[in-house]
Amino acid sequence: MKYYLSLGSNINAEENIAFATEELNKILSNVTISSTHKTKAEGFEGDDFLNLVLAGDSELNFDSLNKELKTIEDSSGRKRDVPKFSARTLDIDIVLQLDGDEIVFESDEIKKYLFVSEPLKELI
């Protein structure tokens, strides 16, 4: 399976994005990474976010990979008891899953947010 992951951070963003890419390289193969996009916080007042999309191959199914992503987020100090729109050490979401040329999963975030669609375009 080919997965495309959206990564974002606005707390120690450079460090947390570097940590995430290092960890993701351990569980994915053939990794490619978009350029980093700086975006304003959306839905709350806060520091700018660094966003990118990372693509890689994995034998893990969607749920197993998602569990791994949550573990990486938690390792960065991610707090889950805060409002949806708030500062983040790290946010990693599966935005696209392909099996060959077939789309298995496509997140609505691709159409909703330029900070997802723009870096994704670089990799597709």
Residue ranges of model-derived segments:
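Short hydrophobic/aromatic beta-strand micro-patches
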Residues: S6, A55-D57, Q97
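Extreme N-terminal starter segment of soluble prokaryotic enzymes
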Residues: M1-Y4
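Flexible, gly/pro- and Lys/Arg-enriched active-site loops
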Residues: N12, A41-L50, L60-N66, T71-I124
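Short, surface-exposed acidic-centric catalytic microdomains
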Residues: E14-F62
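Active-site microenvironments that recognize anionic phosphate/pyrophosphate groups
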Residues: G8-E14
